[in-house]
Amino acid sequence: MRIDYHNKEIINKIYTHDAVFKGFDYDYENNLIQFEMVEGYYKKRFKFIFHNVFGFKMASCDFWGKCLRTDTWHTADENEIAEELTEIKEKKRGKSEDGKLLESKSRLNSVEECVESTLYFISGDSLTIACEYIDFEEIRLAE
């Protein structure tokens, strides 16, 4: 299933509670983040691929003790990471010899809206990713 800005509310309806997070892979060259989670009670595997990643942040403090299980996955109403990056982009624009601002060459320019979502863990930690779109797959495991 493809999730983008226009259908991002789907994220709030996907039940990932107690799925075990297996770590993530960030492919810098292709701007991808991918990971899988396995949920034992309902016997499901979840596959996530975040495309055209603009930024991500993670809290990894084990606030309530170490735990790889997830609590929830939610989308944000406001794209904090994208807004922060847009501010940085504007500050970093150079000026031409006549004092005019140069055009930004940022990948942010190529996307109308991005989708930002946060995966919350039982430990109190979180992983927030801002990207163009997400490919999400829910697979039923054999009994």
Task: Give the predicted meaning of each segment.
Residues 1-143:
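Surface-exposed, interaction-prone regions used to assemble/regulate multi-protein complexes
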